[in-house]
Amino acid sequence: MASTSSSRASSSSSSSSTPSIPRTITYDVFLSFRGEDTRFNFTDHLYSALGRRGIRTFRDDKLRRGEAIAPELLKAIEESRSSVIVFSENYARSRWCLDELVKIMECHKDKKDPGHAVFPIFYHVDPSHVRKQEGSFGEAFAGYGENLKDKIPRWRTALTEAANLSGWPLQDGYESNQIKEITDSIFRRLKCKRLDAGANLVGIDSHVKEMIWRLHMESSDVRMVGMYGVGGIGKTTIAKVIYNELSREFEYMSFLENIREKFNTQGVSPLQNQLLDDILKGEGSQNINSVAHGASMIKDILSSKIVFIVLDDVDDQSQLEYLLRHREWLGEGSRVIITTRNKHVLDVQKVDDLYEVKGLNFEEACELFSLYAFEQNLPKSDYRNLSHRVVGYCQGLPLALKVLGCLLLKKTIPEWESELRKLDREPEAEILSVLKRSYDGLGRTEKSIFLDVACFFKGEDRDFVSKILDACDFHAEIGIKNLNDKCLITLQYNRIRMHDLIQQMGWEIVREKFPDEPNKWSRLWDTCDFERALTAYKGIKRVETISLDLSKLKRVCSNSNAFAKMTRLRLLKVQSSLDIDFEPEYIDADDKVELYDVVMKNASKMRLGRGFKFPSYELRYLRWDGYPLDFLPSNFDGGKLVELHLKCSNIKQLRLGNKDLEMLKVIDLSYSRKLSQMSEFSSMPNLERLFLRGCVSLIDIHPSVGNMKKLTTLSLKSCKKLKNLPDSIGDLESLEILDLAYCSKFEKFPEKGGNMKSLTELDLQNTAIKDLPDSIGDLESLKYLDLSDCSKFEKFPEKGGNMKSLRELDLRNTAIKDLPDSIRDLESLERLYLSYCSKFEKFPEKGGNMKSLMELDLQNTAIKDLPDSIGDLESLKYLDLSNCSKFEKFPEKGGNMKSLTELFLENTAIKDLPDSIGDLESLVSLNLSDCSKFEKFPEKGGNMKSLNWLYLNNTAIKDLPDSIGDLESLMRLYLSNSSKFEKLPEKVGNMKSLELLDLRNTAIKDLPDSIGDLEPLEKLSLSNCPKFEVLPLSLKAIDAHLCTSKEDLSRLLWLCHRNWLKSTTEEFDRWQLSAFIPESSGIPEWITYQNLGSEVTEKLPINWCEDPDFPGFVLSCLYRPSDYSSAYNFCHDFKCELNLHGNGFTFTDECSHSCWCDCHVNFKDSRDLVCVYWYPKTAIPEEDHHKYTHINASFTHRFEGHPFFCEDIKKIKCGINVIFLGDQRNHMPMLEHPQNSGDNGSALQDANGNVHGANQDDEHYHIPTLGLLGNFHDNGSAVLEDTLGNRKRRRDDSLPDVVEEPHYKKIGSHPTPISCFELHHQYQSEQNHMW
């Protein structure tokens, strides 16, 4: 434990005397040591061991310089209960250490506040040398001068006194054993009020902080906090750590452990005695005559004191009745923690706050397991996959991780594999016994619900489960709540979840009496057990639920008679490999056929003869995917059936017997291709949902369908032969959803369909319907009407305007030409889609009356203009007129749409915009791309204060008005392919939010000086601008592909990188530098560590983490794409996994680089690519630096948009280099300055036009990235990125003929610059847009 909390003064208004306030104790141990001797070996290991025992230890990790000891160290010594002094060879050479020692011994001898213990450790030194200041200690004192004559006597006295104390002389032997002995001894001597929370307290700090926060230690009120969770999750351990953490703040404390067990075996009296004894500290205890007398004593004594009490493992309210009935029993300022598996106990107790303890995350679980299985904090490499299997099996349960870790310690890989196979069938007894306690406390019905969930319902919707269990008379609502309160299940998004180990416990309970006779079990869930049960001579008589996955059947099952004896069967689920959903529209017809074939192939494994029978009179739920017979069994009795699911079955006609099916709520026969007709529906009056999707042979629906007064959903989607519905459909007074989509022969909606007063959704998309009856207007509850892709639908009914509740009307891709005036009466309409209605020419004049309309999609229509009334659409947010090639003029009153946020005019015939466009105060995105006639952006366009995105790509625009600078919220400005665009206004520098400026393929020649004022600007694209003469240096990204500028790009790169390396630590943390270099000659020799293939591992330099001149690593990989990858312009996604490890610790991170650059497509002779990453040291947690000794880099690559990693991308070679600043340690070849002036020269020009030579800056920075980039031979043009200065340079400014600089600053030895270079922000979401 390393967490601390501030002290709190205790007070009580009801106490007869105010309790004394002890000195503030923040740490258990202050660790004094000589850093250069032991910091990274013995002391570090000792510090970690103390932490694992829950001993709060202060260690000064700073490399301090100076004469006086820091005040925070003196304070830390005073606030520590003890000190551990590591006397090493050079300890006395540090005046700082000696001052610490003097302070420590003063605290040790302080009579006013005794108790500061001192534990000396003599690390490879003779204790007598310390005591007498001889040997290295004598030599140290001999070197001190007269100026220290006042301190030397105190130093000597402190050394002598400390050396006279009992300690540990360490000379030879295993340090791990010695450290264990020391930590155990310190723990025993410090424990006092402290409890042993155990070793290896991984992941506990966050729980402790959460609980302490909930205790509100600063408050003077009484607070009770409940902590609940499944058994073995660590509640008791957390409570002990909190108890130890807060022990210094309370004079009166008690920890009552394992109350449930003690209460059940001994009663409450011993617990009352222990509580009083703890509070009174063994003094003045009185005999308790009865439980009631004990309760009275507790109330009288506690009410006058400020106490801290932990009541551990309470599982029933009766256990609190006579221990702590009410908060009024406690003095003000008291704190109580109650741990339990039963959340209901906490609700009844009315605690102030609740905290649910969740399992460890994967990394924490892996560490905890490794500490027990390998006695280190990560798995051994050979055991990594097996370890991950165990960690996955335990699902973050600390108890299971500890038990299995101990079980597998020092076992071989074959032994591990054997144990894991055993665990699949037989849970470890110690884990099982802990988890089973919660089950043992359940009632009979709750136990049945629990086993049903474990064996059948896990992961299902709560409402569905409740409905089925209620039909079994199990009182599901209260039962599920109790299981949730007792942490046996959890509810997430209304689904019932269960920990895998708890589920396995449920399975074990079912198997308990007859472990090897599955035919006698009450529930079957495993395919192998089902196969064994079918072969049993006496059949399966006791089974209540069967859940069977057909894909896991190893052989064909043909014992049809086995079902005949299942007289208790309540729940039957025979499913395919997946719960296949044929509905998503992205699944094409061929794939749906393939999915159907998968179901039928699996279904064929269960062969049923024509004489198949089973007594179904107890059956509540039946699901059988691919049911193989034409009819249900002749003796089928569905009298208690609630849901019937026969997807993909061979059923031709559904016959459910002669009984009334009053309990039946759901029938799903979807994709039963042979189903041609349904029997009468009169016998199922309470049916609520009927699914007949994909029943391609179904011709009609029986007229009795109108008798189902409670039917809410009727899905007939993709019933290809269905032509119409009976008029009785209008009698479905409760119907809410009617789905007829993709019924390709359905031509006419019934006239009486308007009687369905509850209908809210009507889906007719992709049908043969031509029109709708006027009665459609009577659907007063209809909210959603979809007629999209009805190619024959020509006219929307006049009375359609009566649908007052309609919110969405989808008429996309229909033959509709116009809309009736009554459309204005759709007062609730929010979304109107008319896109791809190629005959639609005119929006109704009175359409502006639709005050609720928020989205209007008119793209790809024949519309020419919009009426002025469009401005009256006060709620409109989205207007799309894209690809309306005849649309020429935006209405003047369009500026009245005050809510409009997105306006798409892409590829229209529009020439200009009215000035009123500036009145669109809410507009966020304006798209005018591909408007080839658009020439002038309106002067008042600068009034759109909310505009973030402006697309002017491929327009005829020549310039922008000065008012563009007033777009203070604009973040993206796209002008690419506007070939006439020549100049940006000077006021563009006022756009303080601009992040991206795309000027590709324009006629622009230069940028205004104000471009340097755009601080947020991160990307500038200037590729293929043949007239461009100036490059700025104020950006994070520049795309200069195919520019004709003869800039010295190497010099530019050096300036960019120098500025970047000079940036703050915070900036290093936020940015990741990477480069993509096509047409490369390979990884240069100065990258020290290289290896063939995609992975490289090397040892780190000694003390790498302490060197202030070491900023990070260069990681590089040489790729060779295949012909396939070079033929297509996919986005290349390069990744590097970085792994630092050593001393049993590991750190992993990932670098990535995505590039749309298509340079590689055009390279004919060589296509090798190099990806380079610059990884800063500051990205590695500083407190862990010293732990790592090796670095490993692993490289991968794929094409973005492809679902697979490309195996044909070869990783030829990779490398790592450790880089330094300010010296010559790397000795890497750097770029040289060009020897010629003129066009090959370079200079800098600042914002005022002053020219600076290339030797202007003489700061000594060693730029390894430039060396790396400059040593690749490249033939392409350039992409430059990451510049931080606000300067620009001209191509025609030359350098002096002779410029001599230090060799570590020389730049430009190669005649051709790099081809692509990019600086990536780790959080940038649209890095690819400008490509």
UniProtKB/Swiss-Prot annotation:
Recorded superkingdom: Eukaryota
One annotated GO biological process: signal transduction
Top enzyme class: hydrolase
The protein's name: Disease resistance protein RUN1
UniProt repeat feature LRR, residue ranges: 429-452, 480-509, 540-565, 616-638, 648-673, 684-708, 709-732, 734-756, 757-779, 781-803, 804-826, 828-850, 851-873, 875-897, 898-920, 922-944, 945-967, 969-991, 992-1014, 1017-1040
Broad class of the protein's primary localization: nucleus
Catalytic activity: NAD(+) + H2O = ADP-D-ribose + nicotinamide + H(+); NADP(+) + H2O = ADP-D-ribose 2'-phosphate + nicotinamide + H(+)
Domain note: The TIR domain mediates NAD(+) hydrolase (NADase) activity. Self-association of TIR domains is required for NADase activity.
EC numbers for this chain: 3.2.2.6, 3.2.2.-
Organism ancestry: Eukaryota, Viridiplantae, Streptophyta, Embryophyta, Tracheophyta
Chain segments carrying region Disordered: 1-20
NB-ARC domain sequence ranges: 206-434
Residues annotated as domain TIR: 25-190
Binding site for NAD(+): R34, G35, E36, D37, T38, R39, G66
Active site location: E100
Chain location of the short sequence motif Nuclear localization signal per the record: 1287-1291
Listed Pfam families: C-JID, LRR_14, NB-ARC, TIR, WHD_ROQ1
InterPro entries: Apaf_helical, C-JID, Disease_R_plants, Leu-rich_rpt_typical-subtyp, LRR_dom_sf, LRR_R13L4/SHOC2-like, NB-ARC, P-loop_NTPase
Subcellular location: Nucleus; Cytoplasm
Function per UniProt: Disease resistance (R) protein that confers resistance to multiple powdery and downy mildew by promoting cell death. Acts as a NAD(+) hydrolase (NADase): in response to activation, catalyzes cleavage of NAD(+) into ADP-D-ribose (ADPR) and nicotinamide; NAD(+) cleavage triggering a defense system that promotes cell death. Also able to hydrolyze NADP(+), but not other NAD(+)-related molecules.
Keywords for the protein's UniProt record, in alphabetical order: Cytoplasm, Hydrolase, Leucine-rich repeat, NAD, Nucleus, Plant defense, Repeat
GO molecular function: ADP binding; NAD+ nucleosidase activity; NAD+ nucleosidase activity, cyclic ADP-ribose generating; NADP+ nucleosidase activity
